[in-house]
Each structure stands twice: as structure tokens, then as C-alpha cells.
């Protein structure tokens, strides 16, 4: 019993400031054995809009593509960058749920002068307006999610995101840790990320708002990467050899950018094992998603019935995975006569 108390104490040290000491009110969802036995360095975390929406729920632009385009449109109108007829046209397209990628592309083109000087684009101003002061809009439960992601990163997991925001990087900076934001415009860095030489970097496959020139909405926007056989080979090896863990993603695997990067070369492989954490929600929808994803080698796992269940579930999962990862590194360190593993163990409980 003493060892159990010690383990709980270590977990509290990592995640303690979110623990109010109250006993759980309902039985937590069990962790899937095939996932909880993974080591951090065997994982690639895929961060979707659901995570950003949970971290800063008061920012509509983080909740969906439609919310982002509406926020950009509102900013453009506030800055008097569109004529009345133009703004009405964009509002109509959004209301009618026209192809959102095309709507976003047209809006960006409208806000960007025909020049190679990215600094002169109004699109950049609108982006900064939409994502202004994100640090002050993070909620504690969302910070717990980011803390878990950061902890897995520090223990060897890779991270990529479909989001334009830099919430994870901002949270890490607040903790005194530096993360680098990457996008697909820098082939050299993307290659190094895929080769696990830039583990404390976050790959934004659609770009990040702090670098407007790197934002891409369609595969045509990153042909430089698609044509680079060395980069593509390393990227696709990740999907073949590691387990991707989708967080707040839903239908991310239908995203054309994600498909072009990771799925095209592995369509017919049957030995893939990836995971997707989702809310149980509607039973029929959950069943449909699970069946659809199994065909793609992705196990859909319910973390609970409510969105509020995710932070606690992911915290438990992170602790389980990190503990196994550290014990494995300790064994490797002993075999190699290395002291580095000891540092990893101490680092987990700080």
C-alpha cells in the first residue's frame, strides 16, 4: 500500500495544482491496454480543434473552421477592408455552408495585395486580431490538457497539429520551456522533425498565425514538401512505425493536407495501430466513427460522456505512459552505463 501512496504523490507533483482533493464522483473510464502500454517516444500526438476549443472556449475562432472564417471576416469588416457587397457575399457563403476551404481562400486573397511582401498584407492584421491575447483566455481545465501534452513531449513524443493557434507553445513558455513552431514552408526543419531531431517542436501542418506566409489550405500550397521524396519518406515512416494519438480531432483523417502527408502511401497497410480519443456522445455517431476509423487502422476510444471528462482521462493516460517510458529509459541507461535516464526520472516529478 505504501508504494501506491508514493506513486499518487508523484502524480500529484506533476499535475497537483489541478487536484482539489475531492474523491471522484463517478467511475473513471478504464485505459485501453494497447494504448497505455505505449512509451512516449512511440507516439505522435495529433492536436485538433477540440483541444484548442477546450483550452480557450471563449474564443469562437478556435472551435471550428467556420468559426475561424467568421472571426476573420468580422475583423476585416471592423477594419473597413471590405465593401458592403463583398462582406454580404462572404456572409452568405458561410450561412449556406459553401466549401469552407474555398471561402477561406477567397477571403485571404481579398485581404492580401498582389505582392510578395507578406508584411503588407491585411490578412496578417486580421489574424493577429483574431488570436489576440490568447494567454489570458486559457482555462485551468484546458491548461491541464496542455500540461499532459507537454509532459509527453518532454519524454519523447512528437506533436503535430491542424490548428493555426500556438496555445501549446504559449503554455510551455509560461512554464519556462521553449517550444518551436514549424510549418511546411521549411523543408529542412520538417525533415529534422520527422527524424526526431527536433522533438521540442510543434509541426503545424496548416501553418501558424504568427507566420501568415506559411498558412496553407490545400495541398497545392505545399508542393515543395510533397515533391521532396526524402521528407515525404520520413513523414510517412512515422505513420507506419509509430502510433498516432488523435486528440480533439474527429474527422481529421479526412483532411486533405493530413491525407496527402501521411495516408497516401499507407492506404493498403493492415498492421497499423493508431488511436483516437473522442466523447461517447451520440451512440450511432460514435459507432459509425469507430467502424470508419478501424478500416484506417485507428482505434476510436471513448474518454467519457462529457467533454469535461477528457482532461482527467488524458492525465491518467499520460502518467501511465510516462511511467512506463521512464522505467524503459532507466533500464536502457543501466545497460549502456548512462546517467541520462536518471535525469528523465527526476524530471517527471518536478
Swiss-Prot record:
It is found in: Nucleus, Cajal body. The modification N-acetylalanine is found at residue 2. It comes from the Eukaryota. One of its GO terms (molecular function) is identical protein binding. GO terms for cellular component: Cajal body. It holds the Pfam family SIR2_2. Residues 330-350 are annotated as: Disordered. Keywords: Acetylation, Nucleus, Phosphoprotein. Belongs to the FAM118 family. This is Protein FAM118B. It comes from Rattus norvegicus (Rat). The lineage of its organism: Eukaryota, Metazoa, Chordata, Craniata, Vertebrata.
